[in-house]
Amino acid sequence: MTGSRGRQAAADGNPGNPGGPSRGAGRLRPMVPADLVDVIALEHELFPEDPWTPEMFAGEVVQPPDSRLYLIAEAEAGDGGVADSDIVSGRGAVSGLVMAGYAGLMFIPGGTQADVLTIAVRQSYWGQGIGSALLDALLSAARERGCAEVFLEVRADNPRAHGLYLRRGFAELGVRRGYYQPSGVDAIVMRKDLR
């Protein structure tokens, strides 16, 4: 992946919560290879027309930490209406936590830019601040790394995610026609100044 493959799924859309995650936001932790079964299942649920492949995720999650950051958002099972049958790997059944979402960030070589590659939140957890918490964690990591700006692409047919990015200070730069393949959906390119 080159960093231009970013897309976001209903990242939060909680207009009553512009400043940060709500009490339902759960906890964030680094993504590990053992998470990929759940991540790929959620990817196919949210992006059935153009999901990342298992190979893409497997290649991304093992990238050096100086080039990528992937996070998992966990929440208490049942907080978002997730049934036991929705827990693919069984991890949540043991820990009482379920994967509510995930996100990824690429640090551009040279150290002044980052690119949000993906943010996805399980639909039953929409509006609980999980997308906001994931985005805020990515932005914080970019600031800590000295990045001056963060870029992303968001599907033109995803007003929830687009609205979150606008509320978080991203500005539209343009449109990439037919960017998402094979669906052909346009991408809105956005940028946030971190200075």
Language model region names:
Residues 38, 163-164:
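Well-formed, non-transmembrane alpha-helical positions, independent of function
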Residues 121, 155-156:
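Short amphipathic helical patch at the helix-1/turn junction of helix-turn-helix
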Residues 151-153, 166, 171-188:
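Conserved catalytic-core motifs of GNAT/GCN5-like acyltransferases
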Residues 2-7, 14, 26, 30-36, ...:
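Acetyl-CoA-dependent GNAT
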Residues 135, 157-161, 178-183:
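Short glycine/proline-centered loop/turn elements that form peptide/ligand docking sites
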